[in-house]
Swiss-Prot record:
Keyword Secreted: yes
Tissue: Expressed by the skin dorsal glands.
Protein's UniProt name: Uperin-2.6
InterPro entries listed in its UniProt record: Aurein_antimicrobial_peptide (IPR013157)
Pfam families: Antimicrobial20
The keyword Secreted is annotated on this UniProt entry: yes
Localization annotation: Secreted
Residues in the signal sequence: none
Keywords (A to Z) from UniProt: Amphibian defense peptide, Secreted
GO CC terms, sorted: extracellular region
BP GO annotations: defense response
Domain of life: Eukaryota
Amino acid sequence: GILDIAKKLVGGIRNVLGI
């Protein structure tokens, strides 16, 4: 769902930022 996609995007951004 959209929420799952949003969570994946946020997770990816966090991964890149190292947060």
